[in-house]
Amino acid sequence: MPQTYAGQKRIRKFYGKIREVLEMPNLIEVQKSSYDLFLKSGDQLEPMDGEGIKGVFQSVFPIKDFNETAILEFVKYELETPKFDVEECQQRDLTYAAPLKVTLRLIVFDIDEDTGAKSVKDIKEQDVFMGDMPLMTPNGTFVVNGTERVIVSQMHRSPGVFFDHDKGKTHSSGKLLFACRIIPYRGSWLDFEFDAKDIVFSRIDRRRKLPVTTLLYALGLDQEGIMDAYYDTVTFKMVKNKGWSTKFFPERVRGTRPTTDLVDAKTGEVIAEAGKKVTPRAVKKWIDEGSIENLLVPFDGIVGRFAAKDIINEETGAIYVEAGDELTWELDKAGEVSGGTLKELIDAGITEIPVLDIDNVNVGPYMRNTLAVDKNLNRESALMDIYRVMRPGEPPTVEAASNLFDQLFFDSERYDLSAVGRVKMNMRLDLDAEDTMRTLRKEDIISCIKALVELRDGRGDIDDIDHLGNRRVRSVGELMENQYRVGLLRMERAIKERMSSVEIDTVMPQDLINAKPAAAAVREFFGSSQLSQFMDQTNPLSEVTHKRRLSALGPGGLTRERAGFEVRDVHPTHYGRMCPIETPEGPNIGLINSLATYARVNKYGFIETPYRRVNDAVVSDDVVYMSATEEMRHTVAQANANLDDDGKFVNDMVNTRMSGEYTLNPREAIDLIDVSPKQLVSVAASLIPFLENDDANRALMGSNMQRQAVPLLQADAPFVGTGIESVVAKDSGAAIMAKRGGVIDQVDAQRIVIRATEDLELGDAGVDIYRLRKFQRSNQNTCINQRPLVKVGDKIGKGEVIADGPSTDIGELALGKNVIVAFMPWNGYNYEDSILISERISRDDVFTSIHIEEFEVAARDTKLGPEEITRDIPNVGEEALRNLDEAGIVYIGAEVEPGDILVGKITPKGESPMTPEEKLLRAIFGEKASDVRDTSLRVKPGDYGTIVEVRVFNRHGVEKDERALQIEREEVERLARDRDDELVILERNIYARLRGMIMGKTAVKGPKGVKPNTVIDEDLLDGQLSRGQWWQLALEDEKDAAHIEALNQQFDTQKRALDHRFEDKVEKVRRGDDLPPGVMKMVKVFIAVKRKLQPGDKMAGRHGNKGVISKVVPMEDMPFLADGTPVDFVLNPLGVPSRMNVGQILETHMGWAARGMGLQIDEALDEYRRSGDMTPVRDALKIAYGDDVYDDAFADRDEESLLEAAGNVTKGVPIATPVFDGAKEADVNDALIRAGFSTSGQSKLFDGRTGEQFAREVTVGVKYLLKLHHLVDDKIHARSTGPYSLVTQQPLGGKAQFGGQRFGEMEVWALEAYGAAYTLQEMLTVKSDDVAGRTKVYESIVKGEDNFEAGVPESFNVLVKEVRGLGLNMELLDAEDDEGGIAAE
């Protein structure tokens, strides 16, 4: 049981039966470890070469100039401390980053003009500032320009070699055309493919195809070399007057019908007749006997075969046949041999002919045919061909062509397979190259083509590109590394040019480097990359899920339009690696996934999942992590397989997975078993109780909607949970955990001070101050607020929860509320998933949430003079200024409504020409108040609430107003309070240690009044001396004296460090702010609004059951139970059967039982308060939790702690039912019986309006419901007049633009159908884009008249202009002007 401090306060009854061997890894580990590896900030050890940011520098440096007279080398790098901490960055809209210093070495050479020998002339080293490097916050996010962002990990195709075919789509015959592709991490793609005629082609970067032999020629092979690489050679020896003798391969004729008799060359005996099938038995006999070595083939049996080597006349050097040529012979009419290459060979007396071993059954002639098609015959012409394809239009030279070809695949700067790519290639092609070999080799290309030809011959399998062994994850660190490399390469070009143009002897490295490109690349990545996303901060779960997301989109990935079904589909290898449930609905389905709970990413970027080892059908606790490729070789049992107490499989045959198939296997064959049933789903899905009883589509919606739950005013952990709630609350960073054990020294709403007692290091003050976040705005405008859970004097262990955050309750995730629901229709108000709620929900603020909006206003310096933030605004009455202070900024705590002024601001207007009277007055009175207009920040329509925070930012050197000074004073006071508290605890600790050191020792001398050689005791220390005088006691023992001196010095050092830190922070507060150019002053105002639940708000359960509130019914009208309790929600029972999410019904029953047991405990506590007897409380706890849990968690507790634990569960006893291993139907029935209910889970309900009982019993229970972030207040919107579109002059659309309602085509038809001509005319003219008409209407409304006329809509004028743009002049004629009667005709 969880015996942490928070865990003791509320005990969950756990229904899981499977023992958890492995703790769930930290949920945001993916992000943190990846970026740590990139920056190597986790450990200050010397980073390994070739990895992270150091690897990037090493891949770009050293940089040489064009003449190689100077060289710029990379020595080391270091990250300095960031200027502002995370919180300061968020407040000031800055990026949380650390300055990157790089040490570079410039070596200048002297070159001897005669010999060309180099000698070092000068070496200079210097630290160069390379811009700021964004740092990750402890929660795995980045703060960029003041907002929290998350870099989503990307799934992409792993580098390596892939074999595939076109599934028969290319050719009409449906023939499979095989292809092979070598994908590097960066560099050119190389493809090999068959065409319909079985010729092998190659393509570079998907350009025009060339015969593959051209590529092989370019690699330096000749015809003979190519034939040698791809075919075995068979030798035919001439047997006088009989034919040819050749080696016999019995295996090859198994199951075939030979076209000619097979004749043993030695005996001349026919061993198999033509046309008869060769049986396997005969083949086995031939192999076992081994007597038949050679076959006799008739003279024409060799015709049509291909020569394996050039056959040359030794004397003259003339070539009879080249390698790959067909052996032919021609017959005359009489059937006599008259010519052909074969006749030439026989005539020349050649008796042995080496032939390619092509039999068109096991080995096809594809490479030989390709050779025949290829026009190139040597390396030069092949290189020229490749050059023409890659650089069309440029005249090729052999040198240029050779350089280009080398750069394409063999130059480590242009081509990188990456370690992953090399490992994958080695595995696929059975090679053994080192994984440091990052470019291609000749052998790699030859092997790829060989494997492709084997596929065509019917040996081997194609790869499945959706297999997770062929897809890998690029996390933050790697994405950042690639981006930084791009920046450095841009910089490299500039450096090279500068090295050539400056006087190299006099410059320092600093002068050569312009770090802007590198810094810009980083900024661009964090600001505008598709994978850098605004963090979803609605609640802690949405944060965690966002950080664990895997996207197949983004640069170098797929696009929504191009992705087919296969990529999006669930693949067997997703098991335990990617969640099969959680993915968005809509166009991104299957492209954006979530990491499974136990999964982790290995160093190669493949996702691994843990398994327990199984030896001889016994499960051990030894855990191994496996990637999808490694897992294919194993037989894996499921976590819920039946085991006995010793961990042995009970059943002889067990359900297992093996290489992607689900089969029954004997228990001895099993070598792995899942660690936990929840390892196959993601965090969000594992929060759904009874997930195993829900349909997958609804579970998907449930997972997605939990992420949209708004944090409520009062969090309430679910009665029916899954046991993983506390993990999410901790790992998300929403709840605060103690960094080390200690005792609570002070607690208030703003901070917690802990006096540490564990992990104390020498020179450590032993004080931990935790600042709580109070009513801060999240990215989604929800409210982040933390509340302490501890009291002064509590003892706390490391990692225990000391404060709750948004949507957490005693250290557990609490996204919604437990409410009493009834499944029944109620006057049609729950038609189509509508929800009926009781007025109690609104009255007691059950589903009330706080939302915080941020408004900002900037006073700029304009051409006409500076804008001013002031209370003195022209033409504004005192009533409108009631909430402003003397500086013109709204008070904290003011209640504001639409149109209220938040910050008063005036802007100078352009001078208007003056009248003579004005000139006179001006001459008399001097400078008149120049014209200003009111540009104050006002509350937008539809917004209202309370001001919770105001921040004022001033430019350096601009005088601060009263409000800014007040805010500054408060901030400095807060910092001083922190410093003082830390100092008090530091002094207490130090003096306690000092006291321990000197107590009972002899003092040689001391302050006034202490006699020499006094023994130090309590009276002396506490009575006579002040604490400060203790240091003046000189001890007899020199060793002790030295210890005390060291302690004193340590005390001074720590005090100085404290003061220095305080002064540094105060200086930051007092210093002006960096504001955008032209801005003198900026004010931010935060408005908080409480939103109650109201009709139109969207609610949901955890099982994908969602609906909109239709009506709030008075409590007395709601259906009520026999004891008079009215239900809170009425849901439609028809929403369950067709949706097949039965989990919600089980949850309802289980929740009902939990509530019933809670009420029993409540009654027992009442009894205790009356009688003082603990027995009924203990009995009630025993009934609720069962004897086992009671003995484990409650039996040994003292009275006070037991009462607290019991008091926390009076509303309902919380239970945990883990996914796929939770409570079964029998458990639910048992719980209902213990709570004193019937096992049907149904209750008698009475109609609140009539008081009569309903016709039959109704399912009533407690369900956990969430209020989603789709609030009617944010959506509803009305407009009278507002902004218009420039061209069409029609009102804009949407709430954000304060737009109008669209009156579309269909609506026009509706009015036409009703014959409402005038209404229609009004809609199309004055209410839309008849500019003159709408102005007149406005005027007449103001005057109180009701006559107007419609004119010509502006869109008609736009149409006329369009037509004129096509060269047709179109004019409108008035009826009066129409003299010729054109209109009448």
From Swiss-Prot:
Record bears the keyword Cytoplasm = no
- One example GO MF annotation: DNA binding
UniProt-listed Enzyme Commission number(s) = 2.7.7.6
Question: Would I find Repeat among this entry's keywords?
Answer: no
Q: Which Pfam families match?
A: RNA_pol_Rpb2_1, RNA_pol_Rpb2_2, RNA_pol_Rpb2_3, RNA_pol_Rpb2_45, RNA_pol_Rpb2_6, RNA_pol_Rpb2_7
Supply the alphabetized keyword list. DNA-directed RNA polymerase, Nucleotidyltransferase, Transcription, Transferase
What HAMAP family would the database entry show?
A: RNApol_bact_RpoB
Q: Which species? A: Jannaschia sp. (strain CCS1)
What does this gene product do? DNA-dependent RNA polymerase catalyzes the transcription of DNA into RNA using the four ribonucleoside triphosphates as substrates.
Q: Report which reactions are catalysed by this protein.
A: RNA(n) + a ribonucleoside 5'-triphosphate = RNA(n+1) + diphosphate
Which Gene Ontology cellular-component terms appear in the entry? DNA-directed RNA polymerase complex
Q: Which gene produces this protein?
A: rpoB
Q: What PANTHER family does UniProt report for this protein, alphabetically?
A: DNA-DIRECTED RNA POLYMERASE I SUBUNIT 2
- Supply the name of the protein: DNA-directed RNA polymerase subunit beta
Any one GO biological process: DNA-templated transcription
Assembly and partners are described as:
The RNAP catalytic core consists of 2 alpha, 1 beta, 1 beta' and 1 omega subunit. When a sigma factor is associated with the core the holoenzyme is formed, which can initiate transcription.
The similarity annotation says:
Belongs to the RNA polymerase beta chain family.
Cited InterPro entries: DNA-dir_RNA_pol_bsu_ext_1_sf, DNA-dir_RNA_pol_bsu_external_1, DNA-dir_RNA_pol_su2, DNA-dir_RNAP_su2_dom, DNA-dir_RNAP_su2_hyb_sf, RNA_pol_bsu_bac, RNA_pol_bsu_CS, RNA_pol_bsu_protrusion
EC class, as a word, reads transferase
- At the top level, the lineage of the source is Bacteria
